[in-house]
Regions:
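Long, charge-dense tracts
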Residues: 1-2
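Outer membrane beta-barrel transmembrane domains
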Residues: 7, 18, 27-55, 60-66, ...
Length: 230
């Protein structure tokens, strides 16, 4: 299976395959391309480091393995590897990056009918993180005696100092046919893959009634609680 998806400033082309070995083991594969306009692996830039008129093409492969331990208990492992090529605008100090390798992982345990008509999940995951690669910057030397300024290319290592790990707990309860209660809590270590960043805590409480969704989220890394209504 496959298809092309447009998401704001990005376009993706994906192909999926799922194979059931038996009733207990399911293997899924996902491959594709993602083209970002004015973006690069979550990088934010402005001024001299603007991402305006830039482009980034990422090629990725994902693997999912699901093991049904019992009828109501499943263990799921996912992993993604991607290679990215970035081309910056000629007016930006961000010039280019080639074959930047990034990866993400997750391990999730789902238990259905813990107390009846509900689902409990615990997961440990690493968001997308650069494992290898460098970014080429356009840097200028001091002007010579004639006032000429030399522009030179300088490589900067993109591998971060830390590794973000998210430990999440999620609970969903069907109170009635049209009424669902949901709760989620997450502990984040080394936020944004920065080694010295403090541990963060976040949570979400939500109610779904027919087509109405109401939720409140809060965390130590945001200034105030957020209310969502859909």
């Amino acid at each position: 299976d496959g298809g092309e998806v447009y998401m704001g400033g990005s376009t993706s082309l994906m192909s999926t395959m799922e194979y059931t070995f038996n009733e207990d083991v399911i293997l899924g594969l996902l491959s594709g391309f993602v083209e970002e306009k004015e973006g690069f692996l979550g990088l934010e830039g402005n001024g001299a480091f603007t991402l305006d008129n830039s482009s980034n093409l990422s090629k990725f492969n994902s693997l999912k393995i699901q093991k049904n331990v019992r009828d109501d208990l499943a263990l799921t492992l996912t992993g993604t590897l991607a290679y990215s090529d970035f081309e910056g605008d000629s007016a930006s100090l961000l010039k280019s990056a080639d074959n930047v390798l990034s990866e993400s992982y997750s391990l999730t345990l789902n238990k259905a009918n813990l107390f009846g008509n509900d689902n409990f999940a615990i997961s440990i995951s690493q968001p997308n993180r650069v494992r290898d690669g460098s970014l080429t910057l356009r840097l200028s030397d001091l002007a010579d005696i004639d006032g000429n300024i030399n522009i030179r290319d300088t490589g900067v290592d993109l591998e971060p100092s830390g590794r973000q790990i998210d430990t999440s707990f999620a609970y969903t309860k069907d109170i009635s046919e049209n009424f669902t209660f949901s709760l989620k809590a997450t502990i984040t270590d080394e936020f944004n893959h920065i080694k010295d960043n403090d541990k963060h805590y976040s949570g979400y409480i939500g109610l779904n009634f027919e087509n109405l969704k109401v939720g409140v989220s809060d965390g130590t890394n945001i200034s105030r609680p957020s209310l969502s209504l859909k």
